Amino acid sequence: MSKFTEAELEYIQSQRLGRLATVNKNGDPQVAAVTFRYNPELDTIDIGGYDNGNTQKFRNVALNGKASFLIDDVLPPWKPRTLEIRGHAEALSEGGETVRSGFSPHLIRITPRRIIFADTTVDPPQHSKRNV
């Protein structure tokens, strides 16, 4: 059984771009726009890139194993949706090409520990926060 609700999974699978926040060895935050996919076999978010293994975000994850991932959009006239996933992150040397053809083999994998979801496109609006 997934840690994500049906509505959250539908939202994740409708999006292609997210924002990954990590912290370097000095405690400085870094955020990057990233391409991702939901991995149903592991119930994780997998993040890839063309040169993922040589990025600051990859080094940050390898260093401390922490990340926050955000997907958001706004539908007209002003209906925002957001999904934040906080969790354990792994810097892996294989699997990146499963996110998108042509990506490097290096992969960042996030296993959710906390999920925060808001969807104002439905009536009544949905808002939830939970540890998983």
Where do the protein language model's features map onto the residues?
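Short beta-strand segments in beta-sandwich/barrel cores
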Residues: G18, A67, A89-E90, R114-F117
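Short, basic/aromatic recognition patches
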Residues: M1-R19
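Short, structured beta-strand-loop surface elements
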Residues: D51-H106
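Hydrophobic residues positioned within well-ordered beta-strands of beta-sheet architectures
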Residues: A32-V34, I85, I108
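C-terminal edge-of-domain segments
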Residues: P80, E94-V132
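A structural signal for short, well-ordered beta-strand segments
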Residues: F36, G87-A89, P112
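Short beta-strand segments
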Residues: R16-Y50, F69
